[in-house]
């Protein structure tokens, strides 16, 4: 995104923001972004519930298979023809109370061995349920990926639309690389974080609830022992994440600053090499790269402690349950298969708890990126567009007591008034920072004036839409801009519906045809953003041809010939005289030779017109303009 010429310089970039302003608020706002995908989200949750429920039931089924095997082994060792009660009484009579307690809690038939058919049916059912759960989890993952992709496409679109609604004053205070990092890196990181966390979050919470219900159904005491570890895990997680979250914010902020430095260095690499600043650029790169490393390492190191810490706490609960459960089996309070199922449930319970702690790492990084993206979406936009369109113009432009300041208290334009009659050429000259370019930026409504009015044919430009206004004005900037495409496509950027003949006509008027005809591919020669193999002057000619093709009713030339050689400049001046006919034109240039034929010349200093007249009149006054011609 290229700011208009004369935009106020940016301040030095601040150090990385080390605090997340509202983690849970940003996370909630992120969840709301999923609302348009309600059907997909409901399908994801439904599949998650079904898959989790099946996965939780299977350990209980496997516990039943264990009971079948154990009952058969014990039953085979007992004499046949007696009941279980008689076998228990016989064991107590022998003084073997431990075996009697164990036997009383079992569903055993004395003299009967293992029912392998029942075991096979039970295991087959468990296998079928495992396969069904796996398919549901797979389908859930695919639908979740689709949900996240659609949400991110919408978010990227919203950010892109927002950028086009932002005033240019926003870009004055932003490095392009930093903004690009928000639109690309941060959204990519957000997408990755959502894909990693949402599925696990839904599945983990459902698993914990379902597993807890199954554990309570087996043994309330063992379930209580397991739950005692949860508050401790949450306290440890909170203590760690409170220290790691600011580092995630700093990491992505530092990444944006690094991208901004690279964008500035690479786009101006010729200047960097010309003035021998490679060492300084490398040193600055290493400083910013080290900032990214330090913040990233600290964030990952701290957040990486969460999972092992919660796993350790979970293992403490596992040991306690193993001891208490063994005692309950020995006393016949629960069966061996039940304690086996309970131990599996502990693993299932601790795993999502550990995953929740671990995914908080990715969630912190994602929310840090989300805050940076939401910052762009929350920026104040340009003032609302009025509906009326600008009528056909004769071209009278009037500034009435216009005042403007980029920053409050620092006026750039002071009580400026001027009139440009239809078809006239108005040249604006003055030292750097005098406010020349600011005048045309105000005419284009790139910025809103502080007070006063700007009228075109008596219509206040603030009362018509910006698009209607800008479609009537052709503007050639000092900094040329080409996009990756052919020369013909770059010229047609001024009016995409133009025919080939119209493109060639505009190119001929700007003398682009003189060098295009020497190229093997002619108008189909591809050029890149930096111009590729064509010269700076040739780039300037292409942008001028683009403006001519747009058929503007007003023309603004900002340093339009300052980057071309003398011969090309003479050709352009000759073409300009013809193209300016019947168009009100504003020319800004430091080369006074380009404005000798202007109808009116305005000499601007510190935002005020200090002299006005044509070339001969101003020379005769021997004032500021005269001194400029002598310099």
From Swiss-Prot:
Name of the protein this chain belongs to: Fatty acid ABC transporter ATP-binding/permease protein
Biased composition (Low complexity): 1-11
Lineage: Bacteria, Bacillati, Actinomycetota, Actinomycetes, Mycobacteriales
Role description: ABC transporter involved in fatty acid import. Transmembrane domains (TMD) form a pore in the membrane and the ATP-binding domain (NBD) is responsible for energy generation.
Residue ranges occupied by any ABC transporter domain in the UniProt entry: 397-631
Membrane topology: Multi-pass membrane protein
MF (Gene Ontology): ABC-type transporter activity; ATP binding; ATP hydrolysis activity; ATPase-coupled transmembrane transporter activity
Keywords noted in UniProt: ATP-binding, Cell inner membrane, Cell membrane, Membrane, Nucleotide-binding, Translocase, Transmembrane, Transmembrane helix, Transport
Top-level taxon of the source organism: Bacteria
Cystine crosslinks: none
Subcellular location: Cell inner membrane
InterPro entries, per the entry: AAA+_ATPase (IPR003593), ABC1_TM_dom (IPR011527), ABC1_TM_sf (IPR036640), ABC_transporter-like_ATP-bd (IPR003439), ABC_transporter-like_CS (IPR017871), P-loop_NTPase (IPR027417), Type_1_exporter (IPR039421)
